[in-house]
């Protein structure tokens, strides 16, 4: 079985457990974008169990990824999944609140995948902009997500 097939099985298992994973068309667009950019450094906000992180690392073999997720169990599982998919040596997963971690990150990221709590997207933007070099890409998932991203609705907390 290829790494890509293993990743697809991981995505299916996560979806069956109710873990949010990018929709198939979004995931394809994400991976196509990462492949075309071939970034050296990727930042992912909202890593969950590492499906998108693994996909981006498989799509960009020279990339290093920094992931952030609030849920400790998700971070632990993401690390395990990255090991299983052969990507762990190129990933650093932070467990914590992205609004506290993003401001202390150093350097720049060629690609930022914003897939965390939708109601905080605007809060993160002033801190993300300095992390993007000229030509860098910010890829935000689910905008607007049922009114959460623009603050019309309060996002539920898990």
Feature names for model-found ranges:
Residues 1-111, 118-139, 143-158:
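A short alpha-helical cap/connector motif
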């Amino acid at each position: 079985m290829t790494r890509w097939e293993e990743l697809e099985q991981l995505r299916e298992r996560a979806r069956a457990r109710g873990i949010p994973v990018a929709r198939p068309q979004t995931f394809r667009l994400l991976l196509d974008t990462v492949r075309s950019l071939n970034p050296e450094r990727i930042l992912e906000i909202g890593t969950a169990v590492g499906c998108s992180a693994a996909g981006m690392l498989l799509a960009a073999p020279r990339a290093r990824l920094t992931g952030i997720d609030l849920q400790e169990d998700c971070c632990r599982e993401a690390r395990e999944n990255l090991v299983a998919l052969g990507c762990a040596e190129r990933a650093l997963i932070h467990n914590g609140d992205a609004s506290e971690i993003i401001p202390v990150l150093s350097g720049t990221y060629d690609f930022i995948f914003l897939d965390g709590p939708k109601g905080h997207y605007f809060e993160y933007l002033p801190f993300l902009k300095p992390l993007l070099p000229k030509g860098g890409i910010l890829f935000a998932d689910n905008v607007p997500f049922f009114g959460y991203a623009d603050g019309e609705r309060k996002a539920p907390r898990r």
